[in-house]
Amino acid sequence: IGKSRHLNSAIQTFIYLPLLIPQISFMAGVQLLLVAGGLDGRWGILVLSHLLFVLPYTFIVLSGPYRAFDRRFTDQAMILGRHYLKSLVRIKLPMLTRPLLFAFAVGFSVSVAQYIPTILIGAGRFSTITTEVVSISAGPDRRILSAYALIQQMLPLIVYGAAILTPKFLFYNRRQMQL
């Protein structure tokens, strides 16, 4: 138990490390490693660099509901003869749908806001709404800037709205799971 708890603590520290180190210095180090390995400017690597910052926030959002989940629900299903995978899909995942959707929404919001990883790791080859907003902000036309900023704001708002409404449609016949 002691080794497992120590390993868990080490993994959590590694996951939360990108939040503890200033982003510009952390990403400069990551970029240096990727340039040395010839991996900069690739789409998959850019997605992984966004995940460096998305995963800690999603873990923060999911840790409370996951730890609060009462295992007796899945244990009861297995006692009644259901396989673990079936009890996971039929019981645990539906009960954790709302936290999972909100974790996705938070992760999406964090990813939309990532400017430094997109520029440094993407080697300036990928255009996102955030990189466009930052480049347009240096220009004189505030109308275009406001339109882009509104789009940047609306994307997470749409995902949060979907996270709120999806359980109402998925569980229309289960009142307590619609909350």
What do these predicted regions represent?
Residues 87, 132, 149:
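Short functional hotspots where side chains directly engage DNA or cofactors
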Residues 25, 86-87, 128:
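Residues in the helix-turn-helix
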Residues 7-14, 84, 92, 129, ...:
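Hydrophobic alpha-helical segments of integral membrane proteins
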Residues 69-97:
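Short helix-to-coil transition segments within interhelical loops
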Residues 167-179:
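A cross-kingdom feature marking charged/low-complexity
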Residues 1-67, 95, 99-116, 120-122, ...:
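Membrane-water interface segments at the C-terminal ends of transmembrane alpha-helices
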